[in-house]
């Protein structure tokens, strides 16, 4: 970090010190400043016409583009499709507002339960004490697997990857964090696929195709069972050594009333997903409850994900009206829907792939399995995997190469096993 002082002298009087204007930039990263002014180190007087606020703004823009790359890509695709179609007025009609509203309600209630501290308390009870490494690692992997069925895969990882870090460090097993974090990412993706609210693409498909809970469970429960067995077997690779695991939780930070409020809102949201209660009513109840009792949660909602969905709805709607895309994607989804969904997820992530491909098929079964299994594979196949990687990289001694290597091995083996099961169950030889 460097502290930079820039003297801007009037061009008409370069030797006059009375006309100097002083700008002080403190704590500007040297590499950031070097990108703006490559020769600043050798320049005694920098004649520049911008202030520190501009640098800070540019830094925020770069950070946003990096952290919300999927949203930016979705927005670019939506704008490009509108430019080609020329039908800007029709754009809002392409957006499935029911899905957006339900996502908002679920994210709000889940965020409230997470902030209440209950998940951390549950983790403390399950992990702390005299434990074997194998049992601790299995518990750390099982928690996001089951939690993701209710609180979505990304929230499960946000809650339990830091728990894994603290638990393993307290026992001196931090070298095993890479494998545990990778297995947690896989567990969250595969556990979340079992329920309609386990991940965003499930909610979208369940809502769009008006599925029953029985149909949904029948399609994915076999894969969930196999996933749990494979994750349990993977945990056998950890040793059987003992250690005392200590996981401290601030008891004062646990808010049971907040948890009760958001658990009730979550139950209402699930009823709206199941079409028991009209979603506009639940949306009003959730928004009013947050405004009156817990306004902080408004800041915890992933608005970027909501905007990403809206952009891909617009993009998908425009693509569906283009004859060339109808022929291409319609043909692929007609001949190989599961494989097309799986491969598309590897390239553009499974949530965008779901929204895009849904406009070209009524075969919800193959689409659902394809995008859920498509969460395995490349790091960008599922946003939850990127969350796990980002959380891991914030730990001490994090090794990106080790994570990517472990991720590639585990995901390849898991995906291969899931594809074999799919072939055994649904492919007619």
Language-model segment annotations:
Residues 58-84, 96-108, 259-268, 276-291, ...:
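Hydrophobic mid-bilayer segments of alpha-helices in multi-pass membrane transport proteins
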Residues 61-66, 89-99, 213-223, 252-254, ...:
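Interfacial loop-to-helix junctions that mark the boundaries of transmembrane helices
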Residues 94, 116, 120-123, 265-362:
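Transmembrane helical segments that form the transport core of multi-pass membrane transport proteins
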Residues 97-99, 128-141, 170-180, 256-260, ...:
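Membrane-interfacial loop-to-helix junctions in multi-pass transporters
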Residues 124, 237-263, 295-299:
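Flexible interhelical linker loops that connect adjacent transmembrane helices
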Residues 140-142, 146-190, 355-369, 423-427:
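Hydrophobic transmembrane alpha-helices that form the pore/transport pathway of multi-pass ion
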Residues 172-240, 245-250, 367, 389-418:
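Membrane-core helix-loop-helix motifs of multi-pass transport proteins
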Residues 217-228, 339-429:
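C-terminal transmembrane helix pair
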């Amino acid at each position: 970090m460097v502290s930079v002082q820039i003297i801007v002298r009037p061009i008409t009087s370069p030797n006059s010190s009375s006309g100097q204007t002083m700008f002080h930039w403190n704590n500007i990263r040297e590499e950031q400043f070097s990108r703006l002014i490559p020769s600043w180190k050798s320049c005694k007087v920098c004649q520049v016409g911008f202030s520190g606020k501009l640098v800070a703004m540019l830094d925020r823009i770069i950070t946003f583009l990096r952290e919300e790359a999927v949203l930016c890509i979705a927005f670019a695709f939506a704008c490009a499709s509108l430019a080609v179609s020329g039908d800007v007025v029709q754009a809002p009609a392409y957006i499935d507002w029911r899905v957006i509203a339900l996502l908002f309600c679920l994210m709000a209630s889940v965020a409230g339960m997470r902030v209440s501290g209950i998940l951390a308390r549950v983790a403390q009870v399950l992990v702390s004490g005299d434990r074997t490494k194998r049992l601790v690692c299995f518990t750390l992997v099982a928690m996001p697997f089951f939690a993701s069925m209710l609180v979505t895969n990304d929230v499960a990882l946000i809650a339990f990857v830091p728990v894994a870090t603290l638990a393993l460090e307290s026992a001196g097993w931090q070298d095993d964090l890479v494998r545990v974090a990778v297995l947690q990412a896989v567990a969250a993706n595969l556990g979340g696929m079992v329920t309609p609210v386990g991940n965003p693409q499930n909610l979208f498909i369940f809502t769009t195709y008006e599925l029953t809970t029985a149909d949904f469970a029948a399609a994915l429960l076999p894969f969930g069972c196999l996933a749990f067995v494979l994750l349990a077997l993977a945990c056998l690779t950890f040793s059987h050594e003992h250690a005392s695991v200590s996981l401290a939780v601030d008891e004062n930070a646990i808010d049971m009333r907040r948890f009760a409020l958001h658990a009730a809102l979550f139950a209402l949201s699930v009823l709206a997903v199941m079409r028991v209660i009209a979603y506009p009513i639940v949306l009003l109840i959730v928004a009013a409850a947050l405004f009156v009792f817990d306004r902080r949660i408004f800041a915890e909602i992933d608005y970027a994900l909501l905007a990403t969905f809206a952009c891909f709805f617009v993009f998908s709607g425009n693509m569906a009206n283009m004859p060339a895309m109808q022929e291409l994607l319609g043909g692929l989804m007609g001949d190989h829907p599961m494989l097309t969904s799986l491969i598309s997820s590897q390239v553009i992530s499974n949530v965008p792939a779901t929204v895009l491909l849904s406009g070209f098929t009524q075969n919800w079964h193959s689409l659902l399995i394809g995008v859920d299994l498509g969460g395995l594979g490349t790091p960008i196949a599922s946003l939850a995997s990127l969350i796990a990687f980002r959380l891991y990289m914030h730990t001490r001694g994090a090794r990106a190469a080790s994570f990517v290597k472990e991720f590639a091995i585990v995901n390849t083996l898991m995906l291969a096993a899931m594809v074999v099961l799919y072939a055994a169950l649904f492919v007619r030889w």
